[in-house]
A protein has these predicted regions:
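Glycine/proline-enriched, intrinsically flexible loops and inter-domain linkers
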Residues: 210-302
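Acidic, Ser/Thr/Pro
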Residues: 1-219
């Protein structure tokens, strides 16, 4: 079976191979990074995280879908401005730093025994029972169904108020990287579902790496020029060092981070500047040439 585990970005602090149909739990410190990889592609994974300091006080506050979707205005946060997952206390727990798939699920529970029983598969192993088993040692109460981030699930809103699910778009070696915004207690599954298309009808392993915060990951989506092309991560342009000081609102434009607007200016002022003053626009996504060198200013003023 074809499988890819991409090389570490730098030395990981921990590596966990989550065998198919099982789960594992682990803890990370604030600022650390969590990389969840689908080595064979099309294998889905449920991710849960709790604020460790609150758990130590007997309070369970995990990632919450509704709070996240409300604050982010997106069905699933992604790298950039709208990147955070929140708990019910409105505190951010993780930030999405890199995402090479971009399609995940924040509507459904991690799979449950009831899901399989309703389909006629009594006693089928499921993610919720697996999470109950591995999270219990950290004092997290058992649940019939877990509110998880369902990574790599191809879920969307359909017509007539339906929620649709199909085979994952993830390819071998695809991954998501989170940055912990608190000390976190986490759980990750390798989904065991073999009765529908979510895992390509064939459950496989999930691989997790954690990295300490000594280095910083660049924020990136994956961009493919064609369906069979190798993925390329979003890049900063030659102007990013300056524009990043003027705004946090960047969008992915054909593989480059471009400013969407500038803080404290607004659409009207920007429009007026285009008509009445001079503006510099970053057109790197159009593959324009960058002008560099000691005489660059003279050339631009020519």
């Amino acid at each position: 079976e074809f499988s890819i585990i991409p090389d570490p970005v730098y030395d990981p602090s921990n590596e966990i191979n989550i065998v198919k149909t099982t789960a594992n739990s682990y803890q990370v410190k604030e600022g650390d990074y969590i990389q969840v990889i689908t080595p064979t592609g099309r294998q889905c994974s449920d991710f849960v995280a709790y604020d460790t300091s609150k758990l130590d006080k007997g309070k369970e506050n995990g990632l919450d879908w509704q709070t996240t979707r409300t604050f982010m205005g997106h069905t699933f946060p992604g790298p950039g401005l709208f990147s955070k997952f929140y708990d019910v206390d409105h505190e951010p727990l993780v930030e999405v730093v890199r995402d090479t798939v971009g399609i995940h699920d924040t509507f459904n529970l991690a799979c449950t025994s009831k899901y399989y029983e309703d389909a006629g598969y009594f006693g089928h192993i499921n993610c919720s029972d697996n999470l109950n088993e591995v999270m219990e040692k950290y004092g997290v109460q058992k649940k019939k169904g877990w509110h998880a981030i369902n990574l790599f699930f191809n879920t969307s809103a359909g017509g007539q108020n339906s929620v649709l699910s199909d085979e994952s778009y993830a390819r071998p070696g695809d991954y998501v990287i989170f940055r912990a915004l608190k000390d976190l207690t986490c759980g990750t599954t390798a989904c065991p579902s073999d009765i529908d298309s979510c895992n390509g009808w064939n459950p496989t392993d999930i691989f997790v790496r954690t990295y300490d915060k000594k280095k910083e990951f660049t924020k990136s989506f994956a961009f493919r020029m064609k369906t069979d092309s190798e993925k390329k991560l979003t890049r900063n342009t030659g102007f990013y060092e300056r524009t990043s000081k003027l705004t946090r609102n960047f969008i992915d434009a054909r593989g480059f981070w471009l400013p969407n607007d500038y803080t404290k200016h607004g659409v009207i002022n920007e429009y007026t500047a285009c008509r009445e003053k001079a503006v510099v626009i970053d057109l790197s996504s159009l593959r324009k040439f960058e002008i560099i060198g000691p005489d660059a200013e003279e050339l631009m003023n020519y």
